[in-house]
């Protein structure tokens, strides 16, 4: 197993563990009750994974995290409901991978305003699709699943708050150390472009 694969697996396992942790403590529903908005913090590590390793990696580990979360879902739900509720919305993380190449290239070239724009756009779109699937579309298809009203704060406030949190966390990571976003031997950069990372 080469170093790139090892790093990818480690990043994927870290992201999966964080997603499952947030799900296990029931943070989304706790935030709805205590803050009045639904915060999908578990999306942050998956967006990071997509920006770092691409869509396919983000989708695979999102599916793994969702599969583990099936254990934590309501016991009265059938398997179709569990899969649609716990797995399908997390697959939105794959959208972040669309922005991986240009996030890494602009960060490597220190064009930070473009990097930040890519991060914010990825966070916004992933969060939007996740909230639309998990709290609007799936509850319409499966009435047994709790949803959120389109005209209420928990849905829209949660989407915006999740976008802001994800964007701030990922932008801070990019500012603190670009290797937190760009892996060594990144498939999105040439060997010449990654030489500085390899020498760190």
Residues covered by each model-derived region:
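Hydrophobic transmembrane alpha-helices
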Residues: 1-52, 56-57
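Alpha-helical transmembrane segments and their immediate interhelical/interface regions
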Residues: 9-18, 74-99
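Aromatic-anchored segments of alpha-helical transmembrane domains
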Residues: 15-26, 64-75, 123-133
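Alpha-helical transmembrane segments of multipass membrane proteins
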Residues: 20, 47-48, 67-71, 94, ...
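Membrane-embedded alpha-helical hairpins and interfacial helices in multi-pass inner-membrane proteins
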Residues: 31-36, 78-86, 99-200
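Hydrophobic core segments of transmembrane alpha-helices in multi-pass, intramembrane catalytic enzymes
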Residues: 39-46, 85-93, 165-166
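Membrane-helix interface segments
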Residues: 55-60, 111-115
């Amino acid at each position: 197993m080469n170093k790139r694969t090892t790093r990818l697996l480690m990043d994927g396992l870290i992201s999966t563990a964080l997603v499952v942790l947030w799900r296990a403590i029931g943070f989304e529903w706790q935030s709805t009750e205590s803050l009045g908005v639904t915060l999908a913090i578990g999306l942050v590590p998956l967006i990071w994974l997509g920006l770092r390793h691409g869509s396919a990696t983000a989708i695979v580990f999102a599916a793994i995290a969702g599969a583990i979360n099936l254990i934590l879902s309501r016991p009265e739900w059938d398997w179709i409901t569990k899969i649609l509720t716990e797995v399908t919305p997390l697959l939105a993380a794959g959208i972040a991978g669309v922005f991986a190449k240009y996030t890494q290239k602009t960060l490597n070239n220190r064009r930070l305003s473009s990097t930040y724009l890519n991060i914010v756009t990825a966070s916004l779109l992933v969060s939007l699709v996740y909230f639309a699937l998990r709290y609007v579309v799936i509850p319409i298809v499966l009435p047994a699943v709790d949803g959120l009203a389109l005209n209420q704060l928990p849905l829209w406030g949660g989407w915006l708050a999740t976008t802001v949190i994800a964007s701030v966390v990922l932008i801070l990571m990019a500012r603190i150390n670009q290797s937190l976003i760009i892996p060594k031997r990144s498939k999105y950069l040439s060997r010449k472009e990654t030489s500085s990372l390899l020498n760190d």
